């Protein structure tokens, strides 16, 4: 038997701080895919549909006496037929994909000012690859080209959400 022990100091990891969170589990909380026009859309769709994507992040404390939270990343991708003429109204809805993907996390004594950014920026960033894969798979399995979600700036999303909740008084910048 050989001796293969790992010494963190030898690997240069003696000063690596511990993450202030642990992901306990991840799960698909809600998943829906519908083609409102049914099979007729496949016969009449002449060009690539226009796709709009909406994203939201929510965090809720699960237990009052423990730092255990559920973070839910909700995505709605809706595809519509392109307008018949330039500047016209979009046509029929081609498909709607809705996914709420969640993680249950435990926070390990982070500074108070970091709790919100950890829950609304860091955790969504960590679970986003799973969301991207599920949305891509469900749209492909629905008979359409896969919808590949582009990277999301969760910091900007968090800041926009904060600005809506706590608008600055007029005259202050």
From Swiss-Prot:
Principal location listed in the UniProt entry: cytoplasm
Gene Ontology MF, one: unfolded protein binding
Residue ranges that the Swiss-Prot or TrEMBL entry lists as coiled coil: none
GO cellular component, one term: cytoplasm
Tree of life domain: Bacteria
Keywords: Chaperone, Cytoplasm, Protein transport, Translocation, Transport
Gene3D superfamilies: SecB-like
Annotated InterPro entries: SecB, SecB-like_sf
GO BP annotations, alphabetical order: protein folding; protein tetramerization; protein transport
Cell compartment(s), UniProt: Cytoplasm
Function: One of the proteins required for the normal export of preproteins out of the cell cytoplasm. It is a molecular chaperone that binds to a subset of precursor proteins, maintaining them in a translocation-competent state. It also specifically binds to its receptor SecA.
HAMAP family registered for this protein in UniProt: SecB
Family: Belongs to the SecB family.
Subunit structure: Homotetramer, a dimer of dimers. One homotetramer interacts with 1 SecA dimer.
Name of the molecule in the record: Protein-export protein SecB 1
């Amino acid at each position: 038997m050989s001796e293969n022990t790992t010494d963190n100091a030898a690997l240069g990891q003696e000063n690596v701080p511990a993450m202030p969170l642990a992901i306990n589990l991840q799960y698909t909380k809600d998943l829906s895919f519908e083609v409102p026009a049914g099979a007729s859309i496949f016969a009449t769709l002449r060009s690539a549909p226009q796709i709009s994507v909406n994203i939201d992040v929510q965090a809720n404390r699960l237990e009052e006496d423990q730092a255990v939270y559920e973070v839910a990343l909700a995505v709605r991708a809706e595809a519509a037929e392109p307008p018949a003429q330039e500047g016209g109204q979009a046509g029929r809805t081609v498909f709607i994909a809705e996914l709420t993907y969640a993680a249950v996390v435990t926070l390990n004594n982070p500074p108070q000012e970091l709790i919100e950014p950890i829950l609304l920026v860091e955790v969504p960033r960590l679970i986003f690859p799973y969301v991207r894969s599920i949305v891509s798979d469900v749209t492909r399995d629905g008979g359409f080209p896969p919808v590949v979600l582009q990277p999301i700036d969760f910091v900007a999303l968090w800041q926009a959400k904060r600005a809506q909740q706590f608008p600055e008084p007029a005259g202050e910048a």
